[in-house]
Amino acid sequence: IYYKNLNVVHYVFLILWLAHYIHRTFIYPFMVDMENQKMPISIPISAMSFNFINVSIQFYGIFLSGEYSYQWFMNPYFCIGIGLFISGMYINIRSDYYMISLRKTRGPGYHQPNSFLYKYISSPNYFGEMIEWLGWAILTASSAGLIFFFWTVANLFPRAIAHHKWYKLSLIHISEPTRRI
């Protein structure tokens, strides 16, 4: 990708963005053994529509309108944001792969996770992704990044609540009484 106003800071942003989406699009789906591979057509259409709108906002807000000098790498926003982004991505990926490993070692069906952050919260994968995009909003210090963070929370937090309620209502016993949403 070449655009005359882009500099190395923009390319670092692009690498982080692509790292998330390459993993989410081309690696993770092939690691998951889906029991029911059918889904309503509205789900991929909604996902593609969201991503088209979001990429447009991010591209305009960060890559076309955002002005970042080389000194941005020393800015506390960048340092804190990249730390959160990488930490959130790690939490997200590790949580997902922990669930995958449970299915591979214990067979099909649901198995209660009780390791890593699953000891404390019901959906650390969602938590990690929210932290990741909070980091994005901070490291880009942009309204576009903030919009994406709010969209992520609006999507994932209700799902985390529903997942936690499912834990409580299902036959699965939560052995950690301090586990939170």
Kindly label every feature range from the protein language model.
Residues I1-F50, F78-I80, L84, F149:
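Membrane-helix and juxtamembrane interface regions of eukaryotic multi-pass membrane proteins
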